[in-house]
Amino acid sequence: MRRTVSTLLLLLFMVMAEAQNLTGKVIDSKTQEAIIGATVTLKGSKKIATVTDINGQFRLSNTTEGSIIRISYVGYKSLDVPFHNGATYRLCQDVAALGEVVVTARASNGPVTSSVIGRDAMTHLQPNSIADLMELLPGGYAKDPNMGEANTITLRETGTMGAYGSTTKNNNYSISSLGTQFMVDGVPISTDANMQYSPLSDTQSSTSSSTLENNRNITNRGVDMRSISTDDIESVEVVRGIPSVEYGNLTSGLVKIKKIRRAIPLTARFKADGYSKLFSLGKGLALNSAGNSILNVDLGYMDSKIDPTDNFENYKRVTGSLRYTLRGENDKKYLWQYNSAFDYSGSFDDSKSDPDINYGNVEEYKSSFSRLALTNSFNLKMPMSWFKEVDVNTLVSLQLDRLHQTRLVAPQRYGIVPLSWTDGENEAQAVFAEYTANYLCDGKPFNAYVKAKGVMGFKTTHTVHTIKIGANWDIAKNFGRGQVYDMHRPLSVSGWSSRPRKYSDIPALQNFSFFAEDFMKANIGMSKIELMAGVRLNTLLGLDSKYGMSGKYYADPRVNLAWHFPKFDVGGKPMSISLNGGYGITTKMPTLNYLYPDKYYSNFICMAYYDTENPTQDSKFVVHTYVQDPTNYQIKPARNYKWEIRLDVDWNDNRFSVDYFRESMTSGFRYSSIYGVYDYRSYDVSQMKAGVDYTTLPYENRRVLDGYQQVSNGSKLVKQGIELAFTSQRIHCLRTRVNVTGAWFHTQYTNSQPMFDAVSTVVNGQTVRNKYVGLYDWNDGRENDRLNTNVTFDTQIPEWKLIFTTSVQCMWMIRTKQMKKNGMPIAYISSEDGQLHDYTDESLNDPYLLQLARTYNDEQFKAFTVPMSMVVNLKVTKEIGRYMRLSFFANKILDYLPDYTANGRVIRRNASPYFGVEAGFTI
């Protein structure tokens, strides 16, 4: 008996020892090369799994000889075999699978209109940032990278244009990009507390210009896509239609970014083109043999020159990401997953003048953006229960932003520098010589976010319901020092209306939302119905009671419907047709800058005495300062009303989709002019001399009209258009698919509220704008059209591990016209009493008021059309063995750009080819 027990214990020990040390190797059956990253699982168990290492070897624990294992790898046929210790397993390539690498955006199949861009498409596209992916959307087109300015997003619109169809920037319509929400692994990238700008920019202005300060400023403009690298991204979904009520604080659309969370070999990427150099490293580690504990690490660096011949202006980006994933299950009763990530993103703009051509002086603009983010999420799924899912997401992020500007200020004769912080008459400083001004904007935007969601499900006789209920809260606060500079040496001596401001004194912004949604699926005969209907309630917590939004909730109802008709045969192949439609309201809350703008200091010159004998000592300058608070306590959220209809057709591996959409927003944010009456003294400078008290001089009381900028809901955007996408089956003799995307966009950019407009005409020696300013109820904007297509020939030769795509991008038409204006004001404000008065026929008899009536030539409102243009782009990807991938792209290798006439001038267009090469390594 004792011998029997000993024998059994010995056998058990041998089995356990064997189970702990079983190894194997996986290679390519044709090349005999090791396959890195192949998945090896014990068949019938998800807990026992591993991946092959750099040598193709793997180790399985808790497994015995003869157990059936499954070996799988992308592009190879899966292999189910008995497991033998030390054996070598050969995988055969799956040519069909290799030929189906998706290198374009995939259209959505559900009721919500969206496009999904996968990892393979990103690899083939060779992007510098997520901005480059937008060319894959319907209506998108390839652009040369411009890292010298913020890359903001526009969805389903033409973008603002100039008189001759050129792209412009316009602060009045920045809601387009501000209203696009970017989500990374379920948490948003918030820019609400970003106040990083220069007083020389047009941030708090209704005007826009292409200056250094404006091009790189993203305050109130949303996410700068330059800062988002694609190297650690698994997929990007761009929702252009009506999103689920789960997503809010948006108007235009949604960009959902999913990071890589799986075991992958060490990958390296090197890219170089005419503008940029890029490098990245990434690795996904399986921390246990079961493969359910994963650690992903990524690093990236990019250095871009705005002009390859100019070393004085560049942009740099540094990114790092550490992501942990843990999955578990309990006999299919519940599945859970915990995700955690620590991400760093740094963007660095640097521009300075060449001292050799700037008289030895250096003007410099440096802007740095460093974001640290800690995210956590927990997802619990209970497939067997009516309570299906619990999902919790959290985020804590801090940005360290610094904008430093050095500027040479050279007054013509003298410059007046007001120093007063309060209302009243004060002596001002004068500067008589050039000086170097230094400006610092120190921002520390902080954001915290919590979202909790529950999913329930139940069935009836004919329907299946999935109910989603949840809430989210976020807080945005800026703890920075704000605008720091020497008031005696401002960045400008011309109309300086700013003062230093501490951002940490600004209250926090808190958004709270609650949502509920039912996703119903039903069978009606042979047809299938999908109905997604829900509502989202939005409010701002902790807002001062002086604001009209305080305590108010704004409801966003949204509905999406998909009707899948019965399949029928065409040519012996089944055809499926679905009709989709939706309607919804989306809401974007104001940012910190819109709620708490900088004060405006209006300065009126009471006396400017310049002493010719001793100017620096005896000159005297007096100003009357008015401190304006531009806060609009009646500001409201921007709300967009959207509806669309879409037709999807699938037949024999061919897919066609076309949709028509219309969006209307009349409450977009913009800064508008506010006019009022200002009184000040004008001293008789002719009697002034050194040592005289200026208050004893005779003076004249003056009253003028002047204005400042206040945020309002005065922007109107109306979008409509048609989007189409077609993907053919692969033509096997050519190894090619044909992908066609295109769009017609018609967009109106105008105002939704009457606006003041001043006239500078002089009558009887008096400027009209000082006496009267008209209020006009006109359309001060443009109406734009754009029609373009992108035909891509996707050719893949799996045996050669070669993919090349040729895209023919045609811009068939760009048209723009100024909207007709009624030049007759509806009212005017008078300097006599500061009140609004109706503008009547009798007003035309007054020589001053007559000037307020504008007349326009009909030629101003004629449409201008830019003729058709075409470019051809080429991209090639070649795998070399198991470890290396080479890619090449050449944009605009062929072009058709005919000349055209604009305002009597011949415009000659030309295109400079843009080349780049990339090497990828898998180790």
Regions from the language model: what does each represent?
Residues 27-31, 38-43, 72-76, 84-123:
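Short, acidic, small-residue-rich periplasmic hinge/interaction motif at the N-terminus
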Residues 58-61, 172, 187-239:
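Short acidic/polar hinge/loop motifs at secondary-structure boundaries
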Residues 86-92, 130-133, 151-154, 183, ...:
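N-terminal periplasmic accessory domains that precede
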Residues 205-209, 665-667, 809-857, 864-923:
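C-terminal beta-signal and adjacent terminal beta-strands/loops
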Residues 328-347, 365-546, 721-723:
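Face-selective signature of the C-terminal outer-membrane beta-barrel domain
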Residues 526, 682-821:
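Gram-negative outer-membrane beta-barrel transporters
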